[in-house]
């Protein structure tokens, strides 16, 4: 688990991802020991991540995590990397905060915690974020964290995305 000031970023193993796939919210609550909002499972790319784990179980720490508000013991979003860093040390981060928990700094806190963890791992040199050009909140977040746009790409699911990169470690001056 990765912890920050308010969040625990709990890795979703194959058992938890299987519960997400079938939409078993009570089972997830028992497995994770937290309150799982009914809309949360729909935000998790569970089938894709299950396939990645089946192919390489060592990917687990780099994949999807529940974003848990520690005080409330409630899931407020999902975050993680798309997989281990590539051969150039680039790891792509992803995040989604549930609508009722937005505008509280959870995404920023999660990305900073993941970046610190990735840097400490020694395997990642660069953090990548791909953002839809219409997602103003996410664009504002990555820019505020010092990410720089390096291009764009066409995602088969999400359409056009702007690609941003930020070297590790993060050093944010006030």
State the predicted function of each range.
Residues 101, 105-113:
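Conserved acetyl-CoA pyrophosphate-binding loop and the N-cap/start of the following alpha-helix
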Residues 111-114, 118, 126:
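A short beta-strand-loop micro-motif that forms or neighbors metal/cofactor-
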Residues 127-131:
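Conserved hydrophobic beta-strand within the GNAT/NAT acetyltransferase core sheet
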Residues 108, 133-151:
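Conserved active-site alpha-helix within GNAT-family acetyltransferase domains
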Residues 1-92, 96-100, 117, 121, ...:
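GNAT-family acyltransferases
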Residues 105, 122-123, 146:
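Short glycine-rich hinge loops at helix-strand junctions in the catalytic core
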């Amino acid at each position: 688990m990765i912890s920050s000031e308010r969040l625990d970023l709990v890795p979703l193993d194959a058992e938890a991802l299987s519960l997400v796939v079938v939409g078993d919210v009570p089972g997830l609550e028992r497995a994770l020991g937290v309150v799982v909002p009914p809309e949360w499972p729909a935000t998790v790319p569970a089938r894709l991540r299950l396939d990645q784990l089946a192919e390489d179980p060592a990917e687990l720490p780099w994949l999807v995590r529940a974003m848990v508000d520690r005080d409330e013991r409630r899931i407020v979003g999902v975050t993680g990397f798309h997989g281990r860093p590539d051969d150039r040390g680039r790891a792509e981060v992803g995040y989604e905060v549930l609508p009722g928990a937005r505008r509280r700094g959870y995404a920023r806190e999660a990305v900073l915690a993941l970046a610190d963890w990735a840097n400490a791992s020694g395997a990642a040199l660069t953090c990548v974020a791909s953002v839809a050009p219409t997602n103003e909140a996410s664009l504002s977040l990555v820019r505020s964290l010092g990410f720089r746009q390096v291009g764009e790409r066409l995602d088969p699911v999400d359409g056009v995305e702007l690609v941003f990169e930020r070297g590790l470690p993060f050093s944010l001056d006030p």
